[in-house]
Amino acid sequence: MIPALTPELILYATAIGLTTIGLAGVVLSVHLFRMVLSLVIAEAGVNLMLVLAGYRWDAVAPILTSLGEQPAMVDPVPQAMVLTAIVIGVGVQALAVSILIRIRQRYATLDRWEVAERMDADIAATAGTPRDVSQEAPLGERPLPPIPAKRVDPSGSES
Amino acid sequence: MGNLTGLLFAGGLGFMLLAIAGGLDFGAPPMLIGSAIQAQAPAETGATNIVTSVVLGYRAIDTLGELSILFAAAASAGLVLGRRHTSAGTQTEGGFILRTGGGILFPLMMTIGFYIIFHGHLTPGGGFQGGVILAAAFFLPLLARPGAKLHHSTLSLIEGFAGASFILVGLLALAEGKAFLQPLLIQDTLGQLFSAGTLPLLYLAVGLKVGAELASLLSRLAQTEASQ
Amino acid sequence: MNGALALTIALPLLGAFLLPVLMRVSVAFGVWIGPAILAYGCWILGDLWLTGSMQPFSVALGGFAPPLGINLYADTLALLFALAAQLLGLIFWPFKLDQDSARRQALMLLLVAASTGLALSGDLFNLYVFYELTAVATFGLVAASGTSAAYAATIRYLILSGIGSVLTLFGIALIYGQTGTLNLAHLAQLAPEQLSNELGLAAFLSLLIGIGVKAELFPVNTWVPEVYATASSRLSAFLAGLVSKLALLIILRLLLLVFHQPEAAQVILILGILGVVSGELAAWRAKEMRRMLAFSSIGQLGVLFIAMALPDGQGMLAVLALALHHLVIKSGLFMLADGWGGALQRLRGSAAASPLAAGLFVLFSLSLVGMPPLPGFWAKFTLITELAGQTEPLYLMGLTVFLLATVVEAAYLFRVAAIIYQSAPQERRPDEIPKAGGLSLATAGLFGAGLIATTLLIAPVGDRLQTIAAQAQDVDLYINTVFPATPGASQ
């Protein structure tokens, strides 16, 4: 039973598809920057979903063009919400990228599991405990490969 | 194997969500508060762009929160990336077209940016859109001449006072015995530039704040990138 | 006077915007701005709390009556948590002065403002905005410690919280597409007809997982041990003590007002049980103080979710009592961990070095486990009686898990207490024994004093909590407060 391919279905499928692709990307990626990009995709999907929540076929943008009788207008509230959500997304992404720059300078990698391992090692070293085996990669006590001597950037190692 | 499971899971999730969202009445939303706002907004806020009256009137506190989020992100990025910037000697200067074009475009972009901000209550556009154009205008010279520096102290001054004036306009309403962030000075001249009372002022604050915030974020990222 | 409520959000934001500029002009002046604003906020809220008629009221922001505009809803519960946000912000104020202090203090002001907003706001999307503000300010403050591990923990938290906000927005889109409104009171009116279906359930699940990230809900709490181990103790105390409770409060409000499906409560109950099991067992295995506290906090939040799942808000009193109790205890314990961080084995002999801290630790542990007559006992007792009164097997399973978790909790807390009271090993010099002292010990002492005061005044405090819970439970009161004249006809 395949439903008819209406514009309605296409738009909803796009919104939900983008959200799903983004979320799947976050879960499946091993590179931290790709995870952030996947989040951007997912956010685009939900923003489309929000706009759709107030959309009408027979209506114009909610701006008065003349006094007197008005044509039907789309719901202005979701548009305002999307504006807010987009700006919030931009702020979070910029912050994410700046943290990623620092991590890359310190750990010389952006691989998700390697960063997690090094973080666990760092936390354990600060606390002075034997390292807990990582929850996500229970492969026993893997010795960490040494950070390559030739760093990607010599200048930004410490701020 | 793990990837396959993940993909199957994601696909199933997508289908489930689609099935659920199919229950929504598309193209004919309930518009419970939407139509009420459409009916009342021109009289209550004096703006012909109803999205503007939602952003700066009905949901002004959301906008304030969103400005705070941008501010928090910029401040956090500042904390993370630090203050000291090594000079960007390694990056090559932009080509002739970029440098000359940047010089020509800068005043034009400033004009357009401010135009969009000031007409936010009349036409599509407003503080966010205009602010982004302003930020781009300031970022362009940075692309053309990587050595150029933005004045971070000036930017943070604009950041601070633009955000503060948004709140102060809101507090002014409170001081007059009205509610916090209530629009003031509404005149009965719908469609004119000076029609929406304090809304254009709020949008000016939003535009300056967004512009300064984004410019400082971008230049910070660019300068750290340059130091690599 | 009620209009001044908006000031408790607006003034911290104003202070945060201006702080970096003012600090450049005069540091000596700038350092007092934040505490002064928060103290004023405490004064406003305390005044409303003491002189008000204890009747809930609603403030329409921008003068636009809800549901068109956004309103702040202040019942005694919301006021209590808003007051707690400002007060804890003052207690955990980042006093440290260095070149970054302006930014750090600005972020702290933003965090407090957002927390206050979370407690007071009566609009779904507005809650989302404040929720994101809390998140971004937290990222900045965690990353501010500047270690590599802190950056890694922040980015992992940021990505998880990004998933959360995507889901939250999705849930909001579903709700708005179905009902056409965002105001919680308005939604409460429309929910029985429009949201008691699969769509409503899906929206609830999206919101639950999305907001659950901050509430340390079971599957989305992997950030908790990492962030609490890398952030400063003061920040961890604020996050574990207050922010998690606020996220929980939002879920509770949504459950009470909008989503009445039995499935919703069951999902919360199951996730709560899983949270208790995973949290307490991980805490038992932990070899480090802060990690132990972080996992134990996951377990405690799981208990709160179990209490929340009781039908028709019967668990309201238990949720309230447990949440406030955990707020005090966890804040105190994290302050002790400030001096006692690191491996548990290093703590041997520290009772002799700082007897007051050891005494406080034992006091907090006893109350957390639920030793009468400490307040923890009464909080847990309320939950046990409510759970035992249920007939459904899932609730009884929750009760069993809860009782077993208490035993595990006692095991790991008293193990630490035993280590503390052991004599120091011979080979260690006295200055190697970690000492808890200074400001953090004083703060922990403050929480300990509060706990003892509550123990002495348990009867009036209990009565007061009962009125608060009854008021928060009353859906009709909520709706009638937001739409005073014409209930039901709010278009």
Where are the language model's segments positioned?
Chain C
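Transmembrane helix-loop-helix hairpins at membrane boundaries of multipass inner-membrane proteins
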Residues: M1-L7, L11-D98, A102-A106, A185-Q189, ...
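Alpha-helical transmembrane segments and their helix-start/interface "positive-inside/aromatic belt" motifs
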Residues: S26-L38, A152-G162, S354-A358, G438-A444
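Hydrophobic alpha-helical membrane-insertion segments
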Residues: I33-W49, G162-F170, F361-V369, L446-P460
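Alpha-helical transmembrane segments
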Residues: G34-G41, Q86, L109-L111, L205-L207, ...
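Helix-to-loop transition at the C-terminal end of transmembrane segments
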Residues: L48-F57, Y176, G180, I458-D463
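Hydrophobic transmembrane alpha-helices and their helix-loop junctions in integral membrane proteins
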Residues: I91-A102, V112-F125, F139-F381, T385-A411, ...
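Short phosphate-coordinating micro-motif centered on Lys-Gly-acidic
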Residues: E132
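Cytoplasmic/organellar membrane-interface segments at the starts of transmembrane helices
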Residues: A231, A343, A351-G359, L413-Q491
